């Protein structure tokens, strides 16, 4: 069954929330008050890793292409997948587990790699200098397997993060595409040219995905107010740093969480763009790489 969504075409200049947002989205700064509160000592947490429920959670909207997950499992040549969950206090992160590979050693390495990337948000969001406090912060991340076969595994993650003492939670979206044989993380640069994607995002042909028509109108109207603050070069830089593996920041030491993530599904490239919290924190642009 196809995912219900509206593809809304708007002027490219309405898609970016300004250079100030662009910069802060790469590493949100925690307040001193909140950081001090998070430093309070607590008892050692109990970590649980369980099989996640198979029923989807209503408040988390599946990424485009996720409707093919069940079909993929039944198709010839596809790998079997299940979802497990890491839980500690108010932290909950789902991650995929692959089964059915003939090479069980490679399967174990693949599963460890997928899990490591899924949970890396705990230590690297917004960056490795200010990791999440698993004893006091709240995080919920749902995992969707877009596709899984002998060539690659593609997964999306959606949810929210609420730091203790913060004014509001942040909506999250990240992805991971892994080459099954090499365990290499594939990024936007492996599917398309970042400059071309930046120019597309600033063109009149750009399209983004939303499940709510009213939300689409709000996004388009809200972004018009900050259209003048973004350039192709700034957006290109964002896309060049998109996806796993995680990169070090300007200091050469701190690992910084990407401002953009991407994945490909049936000839369409999807990539996220940071926007103001009032507009949802991110939007997803779609680009048909088979016809352009």
Language-model regions, residue ranges each:
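Hydrophobic/aromatic pocket-lining and membrane-interface residues
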Residues: 1, 50
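Bacterial N-terminal signal peptides that target proteins for export
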Residues: 2-11
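Repetitive helical segments and hydrophobic/amphipathic motifs
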Residues: 14-18
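C-terminal motif of bacterial Sec signal peptides marking the signal peptidase cleavage site
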Residues: 22-25
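Compositionally biased intrinsically disordered regions enriched in Thr/Gly
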Residues: 27-45, 52-292
């Amino acid at each position: 069954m196809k995912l219900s969504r509206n593809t809304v075409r708007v002027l490219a200049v309405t898609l970016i929330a300004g250079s100030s947002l662009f910069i802060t989205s790469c590493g949100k700064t925690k307040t001193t008050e909140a950081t001090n509160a998070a430093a309070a000592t607590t008892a050692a947490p109990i970590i649980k890793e369980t099989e996640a429920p198979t029923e989807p959670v209503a408040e988390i909207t599946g990424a485009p292409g996720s409707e093919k997950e069940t079909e993929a499992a039944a198709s010839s040549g596809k790998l079997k997948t299940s979802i497990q969950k890491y839980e500690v206090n108010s932290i909950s992160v789902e991650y995929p587990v692959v089964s059915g590979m003939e090479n069980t050693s490679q399967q174990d390495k693949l599963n460890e790699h997928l899990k490591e990337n899924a949970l890396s948000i705990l230590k690297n969001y917004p960056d490795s200098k200010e990791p999440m406090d698993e004893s006091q912060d709240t995080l919920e991340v749902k995992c969707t397997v877009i596709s899984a076969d002998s060539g690659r595994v593609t997964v999306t993650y959606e949810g929210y993060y609420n730091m203790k003492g913060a004014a509001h939670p942040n909506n999250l979206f990240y992805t991971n595409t892994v080459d099954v044989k090499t365990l290499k993380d594939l990024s936007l640069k492996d599917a398309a040219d970042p400059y071309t994607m930046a120019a597309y995002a600033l063109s009149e042909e750009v399209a983004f995905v939303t499940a709510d028509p009213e939300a689409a109108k709000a996004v388009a109207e809200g972004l018009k107010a900050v259209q003048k603050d973004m350039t192709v070069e700034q957006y290109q830089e964002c896309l060049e740093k998109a996806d796993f593996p995680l990169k070090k920041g300007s200091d050469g030491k701190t690992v910084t969480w990407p401002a953009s993530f991407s994945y490909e599904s049936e000839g369409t490239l999807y990539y996220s763009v940071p926007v103001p919290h009032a507009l949802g924190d991110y939007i997803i642009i779609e680009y048909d790489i088979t016809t352009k």
